[in-house]
């Protein structure tokens, strides 16, 4: 790791606030991927996630003094701003897509990977399972979805999630428990739903 990479966020932010493009680039590369993944997992919309993250960084650069190092890390501050933007987006646009293989410029995607399969049929089945999982996650109310995304998909501790959201640890535990229950119920419904069978072209009915 270079000396520049080891510089503290608050030092880089002060430099970026004075017009140092290299410092801004370092900050962007350090935090962009994690913020994008969170925005994508919450919104289910790659375009919206990218727009939200870009807006978060532009807001920071317009007024760097909004971040107070005494109140926490820059990463936590950026997450909080991103979270607020995502929640506002969800209020305006409740409809969501299922993000399967969306990637950002650093190759960071939704976090659910479609593994290579030996046959097209297996690939299709695995894709369907991933679609079901994402549909179930995105169907959760925002507060429960956020707990599932942070603690399950991003594997953050209860303490980290509580600090990021700004609520007691007990609230995180309760939301995660409820979110898991709703998620499992939704997946059960999807699993038990009648499945459409598509026959290959050569499997036509004999005349």
PLM regions: where:
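Sigma70-family region 2
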Residues: 17-18, 41-44, 55-73, 92-94
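Structural recognition of an alpha-helix C-terminal capping motif at a helix-to-coil junction
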Residues: 37, 51-58, 72-84
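Internal acidic/polar
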Residues: 5-6, 96-126, 157, 197-206
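Short, charged helix-capping/linker segments at alpha-helix termini
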Residues: 1-3, 15-26, 36-55, 160
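Residues within the DNA-recognition helix of helix-turn-helix
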Residues: 31, 175-178, 182
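Amphipathic, Lys/Arg- and hydrophobic-enriched alpha-helical face
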Residues: 28-46, 63, 79, 137, ...
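Helix-turn-helix DNA-binding module
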Residues: 134-171, 185
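Arg/Lys-rich amphipathic alpha helix in sigma70-family domain 2
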Residues: 62-69, 80-101, 126, 178, ...
């Amino acid at each position: 790791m270079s000396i520049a990479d080891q510089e503290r966020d608050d030092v880089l932010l002060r430099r970026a606030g004075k017009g140092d493009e290299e410092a801004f680039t370092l900050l962007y590369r350090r935090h962009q991927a994690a913020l994008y993944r969170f925005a994508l997992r919450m919104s289910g919309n790659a375009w919206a996630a990218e727009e939200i993250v870009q807006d978060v960084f532009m807001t920071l650069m317009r007024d760097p003094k909004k971040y107070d190092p005494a109140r926490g890390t820059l990463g936590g501050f950026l997450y909080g701003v991103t979270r607020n933007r995502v929640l506002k987006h969800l209020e305006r646009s409740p409809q969501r897509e299922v993000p399967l293989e969306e990637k950002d410029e650093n190759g960071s995607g939704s976090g659910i990977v479609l593994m290579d399969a030996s046959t097209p049929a297996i690939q299709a089945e695995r894709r369907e399972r991933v679609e079901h999982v994402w549909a179930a996650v995105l169907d959760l109310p925002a507060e429960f979805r956020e707990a599932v995304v942070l603690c399950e998909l991003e594997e953050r501790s209860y303490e980290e999630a509580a600090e990021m959201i700004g609520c007691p640890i007990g609230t995180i535990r309760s939301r995660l428990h409820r979110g898991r229950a709703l998620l499992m119920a939704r997946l059960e419904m999807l699993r038990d739903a009648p499945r459409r069978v598509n026959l290959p072209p050569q499997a036509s009915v004999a005349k």
